[in-house]
Amino acid sequence: MTDIYFPPRELEVMSILWRLGSATVADVREALDQPLAYTSVLSALQTLEEKGFVRHEPHGRAYKYFAVVGAERAGGSALARIKDAIFHGSAERMFAQLVSDKKLSREELERMRGLLAERIKEEP
């Protein structure tokens, strides 16, 4: 898998595009947690487009921006970096940290158990 890395501002913009499906610069500005100038948002979108993560299409007098790379692919790349940097390459240690989170509901834990059971069935 090609490593995908987003600096914080670009990650926030990508998160908005993943959530909304598509957005104009104004839509992204409105969805941001912190107010940002129109030109700053436009610059972030243009940078993401140059990197091949976003594309745009005309939409009236504006442009609609779309994520080209999916959240799952970007998330997999980010998790691989976290696993290597923080958990010394151990998926088991990373998983143990995740399931020790007391904020996980019983339903979430049950779904995780089901995912593990399916994955175990796939192994020869």
Predicted regions and their residues:
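Short alpha-helical segments that sit at the start of domains
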Residues: 1-14, 122
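Short beta-strand "wing" residues that participate in macromolecule-binding interfaces
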Residues: 55-56
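Short acidic, hydrophobic short linear motifs in intrinsically disordered regions
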Residues: 22-32
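Short, cationic-aromatic polyanion-contact patches
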Residues: 3-9, 59-78
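Amphipathic alpha-helical dimerization/coiled-coil segments
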Residues: 76-121
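Glycine-centered, phosphate/nucleic-acid-interacting loop/turn motifs that mediate DNA/RNA or nucleotide
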Residues: 52
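Short, hydrophobic-biased segments on the C-terminal half of alpha helices
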Residues: 42-46
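Short helix-to-turn junction characteristic of helix-turn-helix DNA-binding domains
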Residues: 17-21, 98
